[in-house]
Amino acid sequence: MSESPHDHAGDPVRLSAWVHGHVQGVGFRWWTRSRALESGLTGYARNAPDGRVHVIAEGPRERCERLLELLRSGTTPGRVSLVVESWEPARGDLTGFEER
């Protein structure tokens, strides 16, 4: 995780997480959407042509970090082998949380 002096606990952030493994066709995007909505996050989970799922989530850093922990928890549908994350300031261009 990269942090800058401008990161503050209450400032919204944007999490981009590429989820590798057996994560398509197993209810993974639905599960991710449910966890994100429970946390009050906005964003989406989208299947990639190469078999990964791309998760974008915006909200308070603590809530995004919790979603990231859940993605890595081993309790997801399917089988997650790797999650590659990146962080940036929230763009504020998302509403709700969608499966795409």
UniProtKB/Swiss-Prot annotation:
The keyword Mitochondrion does not apply. The keyword Cell membrane does not apply. This is Acylphosphatase. Its EC number is 3.6.1.7. Belongs to the acylphosphatase family. The active site is at R29, N47. It catalyses: an acyl phosphate + H2O = a carboxylate + phosphate + H(+). InterPro entries: Acylphosphatase, Acylphosphatase-like_dom, Acylphosphatase-like_dom_sf, Acylphosphatase_CS. Signal peptide: none annotated. GO terms for molecular function: acylphosphatase activity. Keywords: Hydrolase. It is an enzyme of class 3 (hydrolase). NCBIfam families: PRK14422.1 (NF010997). Coiled coil: none annotated. It comes from the Bacteria. It holds the Pfam family Acylphosphatase. Residues 14-100 form the Acylphosphatase-like domain.
